[in-house]
Amino acid sequence: MSNTVKIEIIFLACLLNLFQATASKESIPPTTPRLEKIKWDNSLTLPDLDDRPNIGVAGAFSGFIGDNLIIAGGANFPNATPWNGGNKTYWNTIYCINITQPTSKWLVLPQSMPKALAYGNSIELPTGILCIGGCDSTQCYNDVFQIQLIDGQINIDTNWPALPVPLANATASLLGDKIYLAGGQKSMEKPEATKHFFVLDLNNRNKGWKELPSWPGEPRGYAVSTSQSDGFDKCFYLFSGRNYKIDGYIKALTDGYVFNPRLNSWKKLEQSFPVMAGNALPTGANHILFLGGVPQLIPGSDDHPGFDNTI
C-alpha cells in the first residue's frame, strides 16, 4: 500500500471519528443547570414571652444544632421605641424549635445563657453553636462559650479560649477548621470601631486566638463576612460596616476585602457593597448571597422607611 493511500485512509478515519463524536454530542439533550431556590416562610415567629407578644430580638446568637434551630440572647425595646424614650433590654433567653416536624412549636427553654448578651457572633460547629463576644448595656465581653443540646437539655460549655480583647458588633466566619473574626468595638461607654483581625484554629484551640494583619481599609463595626472560594483558594471576605469614633464621627462603608490564608494577604475588591449590618452566605462554587443590610444611615423615627430587603 502506498504512503498516499495510507494518509487518505487515516484522514478518512479521523473525519469519521469527528463525525461520530459530533453526532453523539448532538444526540444528548441539553441539561438544565440546577438552580438554588429561596423560599421565605414567616411562620417561625417567636412565641409570647412573659405573657406578652414577642417583638423579636436583634443581635441574637443563632444557628442549628442538628434539626433544631436555636436563638439565644439578643436585645430589643419592649416598652417603647428608642426615639420615643424606650430603653434597650438585653436577654439571656434561649428558644428552640425542631424544623423537621410540621407541628413543632417554639420552646422557651428553662436553661438560659450565662448572662444577658447581644451583638456577638455565632459559629455553627458539629458539637454546637459557638458564641463569641457580645455586649450588654454597660460593657463588651471577651467571653467564648458553646451552646450544646444534649438529650434535649441545653449545656453551656465554657471551656473555650477568650478573645484577646472584649468585642461586640464584630463579624466572624468559619473557614475550614479556623474561625476568623474582624472589627467590632471594645467599649460601650466609649464606642469606637477597631481593625482587629483574629483567628482561632479549632485543631489547636489551646493556643488561643492569634492576631493577623488587618485589612487595608478603615476600622469598622457592623460589617458582613463569609468564606468562599476566589476561584483558587478558600478565602475570608469582609464587606461594608461603618466606621465610628468616640467624638461622634460615623461613616457608612461600602468597600470590600478578601483575605487569602494561604498567602496571608489582603486584596481590596473593586465593587461597592452597601450591606452594613446585613448577612452574607456562600452559594455555589464561588458566589456570595447578600441578605438585607443598611445602605445608608437614617435617623430613627416613626417615619423610618425600614431596612433594605434586597438580595
Language model features: what each stretch is:
Residues 1-30:
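Bacterial Sec-dependent N-terminal signal peptides
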Residues 25-311:
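Kelch-like beta-propeller repeat domains
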